[in-house]
């Protein structure tokens, strides 16, 4: 604790039973929500690092060189990105619109679908207001 915050822990009995494993679909969905994109061989050379959020998740601007560094650095310091890489969680009935470019596979869970996508920033509010979209991360 400090002057602003205090943390306490309470331990109590629970009937919750946990498992040491999760389903493959839950593992895929968790990775998508974290912004981790697994590319397949056919996706090689399909995306630039900035298109799949590597400029925010996987790149250090303080060290090293990497492919596409100049483009990513230019966008970070000078540009305006007109597209956004995001994770969309939607109801199972949601039909993907033409404004959305799906990256990777759609993960279908019980009553929702989770997928990564690239969308135009100008379309973000329009897509977010769709009643079948649960959240955009």
Language-model features: locations:
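A translation/RNA-centric and nucleic-acid-associated enzymatic feature enriched
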Residues: 48
